[in-house]
């Protein structure tokens, strides 16, 4: 029997399959649950199963942007009588503002008929006693038609799609549903998960004194909590003894009760009383029972077909026989069960979030099995390379029965099976399994202590790069570990070697994601909005194959397109190969971040960067707000004297000959 907290059994002829293959099998079997209708507040955290359209425009009436006075714009400045007040609801209903009259309006209030502009209160002056019934106001400025009025439907047009199938519902989505008047929502339900532990040695956590050979059941409590964190309904099946008939009865009852997933803990190794796998083979189909991973090798995945009843058609129940060792159990839950829950719940991208980080200390890898090493990761101003980034600290001794190694762990480091020591500062991939600690609190002091002497310059005192660059490799092959990333390192090399030409640019983040729109979109948004990168280069996924979706993901993120950059890259690439015309790259700006899709070919990356270099530095400056023109014959703005003939005169002046040139003014804003 493989008990909790005990070393599991080994042996057997079943071959271990790689983690990636095991996940592929699980995803192939796991099918999205049929949608259900729930109330508005029950929809929180679930995935939308229908498009939501706005039944009404928003705003449904012309509304004031500010507190002020609704006027006829052509009236201009002057004194006017205030004929009504429009605050909310039916205020001002039936009253028409005619030339020579005004109406008081509050922010969000409806604009009375006849008015075509609003003058804010700051640009008006009340005449006489404001308490009198006949009020007059002086309009101090000339306004234009439409000023400070939100037209009908300016936020949301009638029948516009406000939410689409596949979106996960958060607080803002609840607000949009309420805006659209939706009180019942079609969503994909969270799966119902049944949990049981097996083993004669197990007792409830409430047991006061342990008998000889007994241990408290930690796995079941841990799994119940983990499943509840995923917002699933839990069915607690308790502890089942090492008795085949008792275990079979509990499994049959669970399957017939309508659960979607069964999690067992223990009983999946090679002991003579490990009955979980034989029963799963008897009642369904076992897809695998050993995975090439550490910890978690004795993991069983099966599919059970429930018998149809009068109240329920036969359904498929997924079963995971998790290892009995606590750490192995929780690691397998995070690697396999969490993505399965998300898949059943309708997530478009159920895969766990991965990040690149640097090791804070040396770690020896296993020579045979890829390891999911428990670690605590945090963001630091200096990750050891002189730039900000995530760093990882091991939780200590990684024995699979030692639950303390999971304490405070928020990530699983993905260590390759080389048997080598990964030195401190090595870059590795990590799977996020819980909240990441915020930015480090140990900030650099801005002032030195009196009398202190700076003897040497340390890494964390080096000023940051002028422009932060992130490189995203988009590839199913590289993401799955089935091939090396050749484009990413080449792009890093090209950027770093061109740092001076780019105004001090430096690559501070890299990542690899599969060809999936949501995964690409999520990291582009994070790098733009959270990490505030100046330049993001994506590599690959720009061709014609069905999995080439990088442009689609990028277009969902960018706010302003930059077609000129794509034109230049296309021209350069066509000099090399006619197949360059098959590129569907996108480029654009999000906030203060420039995002450019590049080909996945390493040589093409270098060619495209070379083509963009003459203008890229200036582009990055402009995005940051620098409006100075860089035409080689253009007189600098600081030297311009005349305020007119902005470009033409300035340009001609630059070409004039003779001892004295006519000074040309410039007011360029491009």
Curated annotation (Swiss-Prot):
Entry keyword annotation includes Magnesium: yes
Entries under NCBIfam families matching the protein: Glp_gephyrin, molyb_syn
Record SMART domains: MoCF_biosynth
Protein name per Swiss-Prot or TrEMBL: Molybdopterin biosynthesis protein CNX1
Organism expressing this protein natively: Arabidopsis thaliana
Region named MPT Mo-transferase: 19-439
Impact reported for residue 547 to E: No effect on molybdopterin binding. Clear reduction in adenylation activity
GO MF annotation list: ATP binding; molybdenum ion binding; molybdopterin adenylyltransferase activity; molybdopterin molybdotransferase activity; nitrate reductase activity
């Amino acid at each position: 029997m493989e008990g909790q907290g005990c070393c599991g059994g080994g042996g057997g002829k079943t071959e271990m399959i790689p983690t990636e293959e095991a996940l592929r099998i699980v995803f192939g079997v796991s099918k999205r649950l049929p949608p259900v209708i729930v109330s508005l507040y029950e929809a929180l955290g679930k995935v939308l199963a229908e498009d939501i359209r706005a039944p009404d425009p928003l705003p449904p009436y012309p509304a004031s942007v500010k507190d002020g006075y609704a006027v006829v714009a052509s009236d201009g400045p002057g004194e006017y009588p205030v004929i009504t007040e429009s605050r909310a609801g039916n205020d001002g209903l039936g009253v028409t503002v005619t030339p020579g009259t005004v109406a008081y309006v509050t922010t969000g209030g409806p604009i009375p008929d006849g008015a075509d502009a609003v003058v804010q209160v700051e640009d008006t002056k009340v005449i006489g006693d404001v308490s009198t019934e006949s009020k007059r106001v002086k309009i101090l400025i000339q306004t234009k038609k439409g000023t400070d009025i939100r037209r009908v439907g300016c936020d949301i047009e009638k029948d516009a799609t406000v939410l689409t199938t596949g979106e996960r519902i958060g607080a803002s989505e609840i607000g949009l549903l309420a805006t659209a008047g939706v009180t019942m929502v079609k969503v994909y339900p969270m799966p119902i998960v049944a949990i049981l532990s097996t083993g004669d040695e197990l007792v409830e956590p409430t047991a006061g004194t342990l008998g000889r050979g007994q241990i408290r059941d930690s796995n079941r409590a841990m799994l119940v909590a983990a499943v509840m964190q995923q917002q699933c309904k839990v069915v607690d099946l308790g502890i089942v003894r090492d008795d085949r008939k008792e275990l079979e009865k509990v499994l049959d009852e669970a399957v017939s009760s309508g659960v979607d997933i069964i999690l067992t803990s223990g009983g999946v190794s090679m002991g003579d009383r490990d009955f979980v796998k034989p029963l799963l083979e008897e009642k369904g189909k076992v897809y695998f029972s050993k995975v090439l991973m550490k910890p978690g090798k004795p993991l069983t995945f099966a599919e059970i077909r429930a018998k149809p009843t009068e109240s329920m058609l036969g359904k498929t129940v997924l079963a995971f026989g998790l290892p009995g060792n606590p750490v192995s159990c929780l690691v397998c839950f995070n690697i396999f069960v969490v993505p399965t829950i998300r898949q059943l719940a309708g997530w478009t991208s159920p895969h766990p979030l991965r990040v690149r980080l640097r090791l804070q200390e040396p770690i020896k890898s296993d020579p045979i099995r890829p390891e999911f090493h428990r670690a605590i990761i945090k963001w630091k101003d200096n990750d050891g390379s002189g730039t900000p980034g995530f760093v990882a600290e091991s939780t200590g001794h990684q024995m699979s029965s030692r639950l303390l190694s999971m304490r405070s762990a928020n990530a699983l480091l993905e260590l390759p099976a080389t048997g080598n020591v990964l030195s401190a500062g090595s870059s590795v991939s990590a799977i996020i399994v819980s909240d990441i600690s915020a930015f480090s609190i140990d900030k650099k002091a801005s002032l030195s202590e009196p009398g202190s002497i700076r003897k040497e310059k340390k890494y964390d005192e080096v000023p940051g790069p002028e422009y932060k660059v992130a490189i995203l490799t988009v590839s199913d092959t590289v993401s799955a570990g089935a091939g090396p990333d050749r484009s990413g390192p080449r792009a890093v090399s090209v950027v770093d070697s061109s740092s001076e030409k780019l105004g001090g640019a430096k690559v501070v983040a890299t990542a690899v994601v599969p060809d999936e729109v949501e995964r690409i979109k999520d990291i582009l948004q994070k790098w733009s909005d959270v990490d505030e990168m100046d330049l993001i280069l994506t590599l690959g996924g720009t061709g014609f194959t069905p999995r080439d979706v990088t442009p689609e993901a990028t277009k969902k993120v960018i706010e302003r397109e930059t077609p000129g950059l794509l034109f230049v890259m296309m021209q350069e690439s066509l000099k090399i190969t006619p197949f360059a015309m098959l590129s569907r790259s996108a480029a654009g700006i999000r906030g203060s971040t420039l995002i450019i899709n590049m080909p996945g070919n390493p040589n093409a990356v270098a060619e495209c960067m070379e083509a963009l270099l003459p203008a890229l530095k200036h582009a990055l400056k402009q995005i940051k707000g620098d409006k100075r023109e860089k035409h080689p014959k253009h007189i600098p703005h600081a030297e311009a004297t005349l305020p007119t003939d902005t470009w033409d005169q300035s340009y001609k002046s630059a070409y004039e000959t003779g001892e004295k040139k006519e000074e040309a003014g410039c007011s360029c804003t491009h």
